[in-house]
C-alpha cells in the first residue's frame, strides 16, 4: 500500500474513532442554562458512559433574538442527542423521547396537546373545533366557534353570540336585557 493511502486510511480511522454521527438516547441532567439559550446537559451512555455532556445546543422549530418556541424538557426526561459534525464537544438536543404510554390526554389524530410537568394544559382540538386552557387545580377556558365557556369550581360562565349565561342559566344577559332563573326578575324588555 502506498504511503499516501496508508496515511489517508489512518486519518479516516482516527476520525471515525473520535466522531459520533447520528442520534443517541440521552437523559436530561440540567436545564439551568447560564446563557439562557435553551441548552441542556444530558447523560448519553452509548457515547459518554457515565459522563454528562457539555451544554447541548437546542434544535428548535422556531427561534430568534427575543422570540421563538421554548419548551424545555424536564430533568430526567429522555432526549435525542446528536453531535455537530460528529464532535463530542458540540452536542445538540434535537427532541424528546415519548415514553411508553406517555402521550398526554386528550388523544386523537387531530388533537394537539401541550402539558407541562405541573399539569397546565393547552389543547388544540380540531376534532371538536375548540381550544382549551386547563389549570391543574380546576380552572378551565374553552373557546369554540359559537361559544366560550369558563369554569372554576361550581361557577360556569357561557358566552354565545346572543347571550351570556352564568351558572347554567341562573342569570342570563341578552341583547334584550337581564333575567334570573324562571324569570324571577327581569331588567329590560
Per-segment meaning from a language model:
Residues 43-49, 53, 76-80:
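Catalytic cores of peptidoglycan-degrading enzymes
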Residues 35-43:
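Short aromatic-glycine-enriched beta-strand elements
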Residues 49-70:
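Beta-strand/loop nucleic-acid-binding surfaces
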Residues 1-9, 13, 70-78, 83-189:
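Right-handed beta-helix
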Residues 11-17, 27, 61-65:
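Asp/Glu-centered strand-loop micro-motifs enriched in Gly/Pro and often flanked by an aromatic residue
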Residues 20-34:
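Structural detector for short beta-strands of small beta-barrel domains
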